[in-house]
Amino acid sequence: SMLFVIHSILLKKSIFMPQGKACTIVKYELLAAPDKIRIDLRPLFAHRINSEVCPEPRKGEFDLVSSENSTIGVEGKGHKSYFKATSGTWAAKPLWYENLIYEQDDIPETPSVDHLWSPGYVSNDIAEGDVLYVILSDEPITMTIEDILSVEKECSERFENILEQANLPALSSAEQDMIAASYHLIDDRDDPVSPVYTGYPSVEFKARDTFVSLPGLTLATGREKIAERALRIWTDICKENDWVMPERIAPDKRCVFEAADNGLWFVYAADKYTKHVGIRNEDSDIRDAARKITDRYITDIKNLDLTCEKNMLLKVDSDDPLRHWMDAVAAGETVVHRRGYLVEVNALWYNALKVSEKFAEADNDIPAKEKYAEMAEKCAESFREIFWNNEKKCLYDWVDPSATAKDTAIRPNQILAASLSYSPITDDMAKGVIRICWDELYTTYGLRTLDPRQDKFKGRSEGRLDQRMKARFRGMAWPWLLGEFISAFLKYNPTRTDLGWIFMRPFNSHLRHRCLGGIAECFDGMMPYKPHGDVLSAMALGELLRVLHENLQFDE
């Protein structure tokens, strides 16, 4: 809801979308006014997807095809849309709103100047206490005022049910908004595609985004069945591809294989799920899938350029940036060069071995348990030997065994070695990792992707497209990494939940701007920390909800 204050006039505007209905409803309430006021509502029509603009006004591109009282229908660009107000007088006055400049445009290679068409406006005279509804749809609108009041009540009750269902106390309105926003990222229809969206406006189905966000979006909010369904869907997809996890599912349902860590994130999510619901016989297929995925990493995965070396570390034999999550390419240049042993991949790998060891024991497969335990011990030993930077008391981001020198740039990927349930490093090493991430990478809304002291550091998304792409992984801050940082910090400082809340507090303000109740995908790594990317990100929101559930919910 939004409150407009114009002198002594208070006008409240609320927007809600009824579940299962192809419409959006806008409610206007005149809370206070000394006299009657006139309100003119002029709809603007675009008929485009979010990544496009109308480059110039074209005569005849839109037509008013129906007009009856305060209900109109508009046709244009191959689409139809409908507008209805519950009261008022329609006045036809077509015009173009030209040269609308969008303040921020994060969609690559698209212009930010738009033109919108309007056929006229609805005029109303309203007094204090009056309510006016507007319905927007791509289907003819037949809803009566009784129907509108009914769906408004349903939406209100659904919100209350969401809060009651959550597995964490809604201690503030901000947390309530986060819980409610999580429902916009879940598709609970009977569909073979993953039930978790990457965010808005991207709306994609990606493995890593699903598994990172699953504990927060589903387990923390009381939707264990959605988590179970997501794990089973991706299990079937992975099984069909020789237990190699794809990066994403394309719109044509085709599997796309890119990054080396997706399968390891599945094991992470399966572990979180079983910790939450317990070891149950009916989930044996999920545990079995996690073990099969782990076993698949032991053999070479050629389409991911991935090998498991004799030292039990995973090695990426490629310069392809798509093999890891920092995958940006700007003007043909790889933004972050990484190859060989990648720190987050091997931290996840050690975690997967330990989880598989636990699952094997739960299923009474003692030989497999012993095998995973032996491999994990060797992996941890090699991890400490290869990645530990004794000079800076932190971890190298990546190590190419064929190179003569190591990249000493400080990046946030090392935080996973401290935050995951099973850590391949000692407590002293983990505390060093946490310290350097706090000193060099921590910002108000996330961990920077590069130490500001580096020459290549670019903390703001600004300038040419290639410069904006470089900034994503050369200095911008990511909230999902902050979730891992908070978990790591509280893991080794369990009595300092007060600082955990301090790390979370800045998001109270962010939740009131842009996407209400949502967390943006990434932020500038420098003041004023402007948000970018998806206005509602599954990974960002999911990680913060997970922290509330796992680390902070029992703190008084």
Protein language model annotation of sequence segments:
Residues 1-19, 100-103, 110:
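Extended, loop-rich substrate-binding clefts of extracytoplasmic carbohydrate-active enzymes
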Residues 21-23, 29, 33-204, 280-281, ...:
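Acidic/polar, glycine-enriched structural segments that form the non-catalytic walls/loops
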Residues 32-33, 54-57, 126-128, 204-210, ...:
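Aromatic-rich carbohydrate-recognition surfaces in CAZymes
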Residues 40, 147-163, 170, 174-178, ...:
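Extended, well-ordered alpha-helical scaffold segments
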Residues 117-123, 193-211, 250-263, 331-347, ...:
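Solvent-exposed loop and edge beta-strand segments that line ligand/cofactor-binding
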Residues 176, 245, 298, 302-309, ...:
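Catalytic cores of carbohydrate-active enzymes
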Residues 180-191, 232-240, 509-516:
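Glycine-rich, acidic and aromatic/proline-enriched surface loops and short helix-turn segments
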Residues 319-337:
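A short, charged helix-loop
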